[in-house]
Amino acid sequence: MNVHFKNINPVDSSVLKKRPVRILVFKTNLRFKKDIRHIEPLLDQHPGIMCWNVDRYDIDNVLRIETMHIQPKEIIRLVTKAGYFCEELPD
């Protein structure tokens, strides 16, 4: 498994008590390192993304995002605007 971890930001524990961390999971076509490098600045600079990673060797090229307040539609818009496929995977 080849997983890329990015944008790991520490979170104040008092914030977690008010709002739990949500894990959003998406099917993508982020297959190559160049694809990840292309979206890296977009995801790293997004203030609502605590942590993200891509499993390029999963059949669905899974993008996993940890957040407290971002809606899946926002991630889909961000990734598709960069020219990639992105679809939320069901729980």
Residue ranges and their predicted role:
Residues 17, 52-54, 83-91:
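Conserved short beta-strand edge segments in small beta-sheet-based binding/regulatory domains
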Residues 2-4:
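Conserved phosphate-binding loops in N-terminal lobes of ATP-dependent enzymes
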Residues 6-12, 44-51:
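Short amphipathic beta-strand starts and helix->beta connectors
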Residues 67-72:
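Helix N-cap motif at beta-to-alpha junctions
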